[in-house]
């Protein structure tokens, strides 16, 4: 653990008069809680580097639940997020903070996170495809296995024109019932490919990931959604989060 690790800060808060308490996501150790001693002091060179969306190299150690930051270096400048992409980045940071246990390795998820942040930084349109892909990747890493390509009842491949209702712990079963848990075969194929060519498949992906993530998040609302509603135009909030 004393070696250098690639990492991102998910969240930070003041700790004592001159230090910071950090929630970081690392390549090798997963999510880790760190104390950055003296990081808030006037002479500290760390303050500017220990920010969300800045690619970092960190070295830390300690035996308790809270580790001590030994060294930190910014690999590059913070990825340029602003407006809707900034709130999207804050959303995925909060998502990781809520669903990942401390010190559980998720090396592949780390690169999914990096790819998502890079996609948000380069987005020229809606950030939603990048968010949905990351949510689906996160669910996969958490062990949430779902077969999007075959009917769980018959075993037959899904048909674009048929509808399938999701049943927890079973999968998608052909159904004539139309409700919030019902998806078309076309939508399921889009979820499986993680490609969303139109508004219909994007809405379906959001509906599924919200439903699938709910048990992990519990009843506590996400703060990033509330911030988004407060500071972004109402039309943007409606299309992005509702």
Curated annotation (Swiss-Prot):
Keyword DNA repair included in the entry's annotation: yes
Signal peptide residues on this chain, from the entry's feature table: none
Superkingdom of the source species: Bacteria
GO cellular component: bacterial nucleoid
UniProt key word DNA damage: yes
InterPro entries with a match to the protein in the record: ARFGAP/RecO, DNA_rep/recomb_RecO_N, NA-bd_OB-fold, RecO, RecO_C
Keyword annotations of the record: DNA damage, DNA recombination, DNA repair
One Gene Ontology biological process: DNA recombination
Pfam families reported for this sequence: RecO_C (PF02565), RecO_N (PF11967)
Family to which this protein belongs: Belongs to the RecO family.
Job description of the protein: Involved in DNA repair and RecF pathway recombination.
Subunit structure: Monomer.
NCBIfam families with a match to the protein in the record: reco
Name of the featured protein: DNA repair protein RecO
Organism listed in the record: Escherichia coli O139:H28 (strain E24377A / ETEC)
Gene (UniProt): recO
